[in-house]
Structure formats: structure tokens, C-alpha cells
Amino acid sequence: MQDLEFSTYHQPVLAPAVLEALQPKAGGLYLDATVGGGGHTALLLRREPTCRVLAIDQDPMALAAAQEFLAPFGDRVQFWHGNFADLPVAEPMFDGILADLGVSSAQLDRPERGFSFRFDAPLDMRMNPANPLTAATVINHYSEQELADIFYEYGEERFARRIARQIVARRPLNRTQELAQLVAHCLKASPRQRIHPATRVFQALRIYVNQELAVLDQFLARSPHWLKPTGRIAVISFHSLEDRRVKQAWRANPLLEVVTRKPIVADAVEVSLNPRSRSAKLRIAVRTSA
């Protein structure tokens, strides 16, 4: 089945640290708020044979792959399709919560999803295909000022205005590599650059299309209320916009005691085996007894 590509691609980042963070216990109930390929959920279920996991994802292809990958665990894992900020939970019920933020390797490696400039594909970038807004709509219909604001706010792109001006002059742009080449030309980038010059623009578009930061803010506000007293929450972020939000929200929340003064990062061995882990940052907090 093609959707199993999600499972084969999903090497769970910071696996030992996640297990140490959540400390799965006998009979515990855990929330994997971004199940993706199912790697982290499988870790929890294998570590503690009597714990259970509610696994959710807004990407129906990822969820279908996770359901098949995790089928051997039977009814110890339940699935819910939707955004983690919209989970209908009204009371403390989880012993631990995990959120692995951002786009997965499987999503990046599927050309038709339009997340990556490594492939020539339609500018899509929707994590949930039911979302009516695509990256192409943003690129081709938003004003120069709106585009510049998106690139600066969500990509921290210092040449946002220059790039937006060129996009408006050259559009329509409907393909990933069209946009990537325009940005590279606009910035007069050297082919020897380690990071592609369009990286920040693509990040900004993906975050905007999926409203990732607004959704994360909702999750950070609601999720502490879903934890039982002494329950643990772990969030893996992949860029400073996410990490900053996690740090500030937890510090300001009286329901949480922050465990990690500084985020946990991957060591050189993990980075060599799983390059996606290079930018991963793990923060941990514990629900107080209040």
C-alpha cells in the first residue's frame, strides 16, 4: 500500500529522550498529538505493554498509514482525524502528551504535496487536503505587502520585500521549482550555499497555509488542562518560531513546571542517521498537582 511510505520514512527523532520525557507507566493513557508515521507511538507502546495511546493527525494519508503500521497493537491505540488544537477534551485524562511539530519527511518526499522545492510539483502545501487555501493561491492572489509580511513573519526572511516584489512582477507561479528558482535568482544565490535560498520562503508559506503557529498557540493553551496531575508533556519543535512559543507559553502557565531549562537536541550520531533531527528541539514540562 502506497500510504505505508509514511511509516518507512518516519524515524522518530530524539527517541530515547522522548521515552525519558514521558516515562510511560503501567495502565497509562497517552496522547500522540501528531502521530505521523507512528514511530513515537510505537516506542511508547513497546516500552510499557499496558499503556494506551490516542493518536491523532490532521493529514488523512499519514493517519491511514499509522493505522496500518500500528495495527499489531490492537485496541491499545485509538485514532482521531483532526487538528490537535481541536481535540474535544474537557477534563484531565492523559498521563502524557507528545507533539512532534512541523512537516514530516514523508510529506516532504511526496512531490504531489508541494512542500519541497526538490521536486517540480504544484504549489500546494496543505497538511489537510480539506483546507481550501493552497500556497499557489497565496502566491498568485495576495498583494506584494501581504506576501512580504508572510515571508518576514513566518520565515524570518530579511529580503522579504525584494522577493515579494519579484513574485508579483513574475506571476502566475504555480510550480514549486518555478518559485524556488525565482527566489534564488532574486537573491543572487551561490550554487554552493548549504541552505537553499528558498528555504525560508517555503517555510513561511507552509506555516501560513496551515496556520501552524495559531494552531500551536491554541494547543499550548489547552493541552495543560488535558493532563492529569504529575502528567508530562513533551514538544519537539524544528525552528525558533515554534520553540520560542513553547518556552514562553509554558513559563507563563501556572499549571506547568518546566523540566528543561534548555531544549534537548540530537547528538552527532543521531544527526548522521536521521538528518531531520538536526534542527529538532525537545522541551518537557510536568503538570502540577493543582
Curated annotation (Swiss-Prot):
Q: Name one GO molecular function term.
A: rRNA (cytosine-N4-)-methyltransferase activity
Q: Which reaction does it catalyse?
A: cytidine(1402) in 16S rRNA + S-adenosyl-L-methionine = N(4)-methylcytidine(1402) in 16S rRNA + S-adenosyl-L-homocysteine + H(+)
Gene3D superfamilies reported in the protein's UniProt record: Putative methyltransferase TM0872, insert domain, Vaccinia Virus protein VP39
Transferase recorded as keyword: yes
Residues bound to S-adenosyl-L-methionine: G38, G39, H40, D57, F84, D100, Q107
* Compartments reported by the entry: Cytoplasm
Top-rank taxon, per record: Bacteria
Primary role: Specifically methylates the N4 position of cytidine in position 1402 (C1402) of 16S rRNA.
- UniProt name for this protein: Ribosomal RNA small subunit methyltransferase H
Source organism per UniProt: Thermosynechococcus vestitus (strain NIES-2133 / IAM M-273 / BP-1)
* Gene (name only): rsmH
